[in-house]
Amino acid sequence: MIQTETRLEVADNTGAREVMCIKVLGGSKRRYASIGDIIKVTVKEATPRGRVKKGEIYNAVVVRTAKGVRRQDGSLIKFDGNAAVLLNAKLEPIGTRIFGPVTRELRSERFMKIVSLAPEVL
């Protein structure tokens, strides 16, 4: 569960290391985001020659949460930390590589590019 002020690691090669959620998109009073939800983030830590700079604001999709996601068969998939992939204004990934596993819940038409770039789909 991701909410405002939550810090997430970045699971792509855009140059951002850590981002902070500043808004959960999808409804005026929406408080929490889970895997597959789009959030508005600001870059808190970035590499020197990366594609993004500290302080810039982007859309991002949550790909891993410590809270996890419950499947229809009753199983629960949890991760060690929270991670997101940065998106542009058209909701396409900015990076060209994805690091770490992602879940099957991202397999919608909107995020098939992320699933295809990921090294492992759980």
UniProtKB/Swiss-Prot annotation:
GO biological process: translation
Keywords: Ribonucleoprotein, Ribosomal protein, RNA-binding, rRNA-binding
Protein's organism: Paraburkholderia xenovorans (strain LB400)
Protein name, as recorded: Large ribosomal subunit protein uL14
UniProt function note: Binds to 23S rRNA. Forms part of two intersubunit bridges in the 70S ribosome.
Pfam families referenced in this protein's UniProt entry, alphabetically: Ribosomal_L14
Highest taxon above the source species: Bacteria
Assigned GO CC terms: cytosolic large ribosomal subunit
Molecular-function GO terms, alphabetical: large ribosomal subunit rRNA binding; structural constituent of ribosome
Entry similarity comment: Belongs to the universal ribosomal protein uL14 family.
InterPro entries named in the record: Ribosomal_uL14, Ribosomal_uL14_bac-type, Ribosomal_uL14_CS, Ribosomal_uL14_sf
Presence of the UniProt keyword Ribonucleoprotein in the record: yes
Quaternary structure note: Part of the 50S ribosomal subunit. Forms a cluster with proteins L3 and L19. In the 70S ribosome, L14 and L19 interact and together make contacts with the 16S rRNA in bridges B5 and B8.
Record PROSITE patterns: RIBOSOMAL_L14
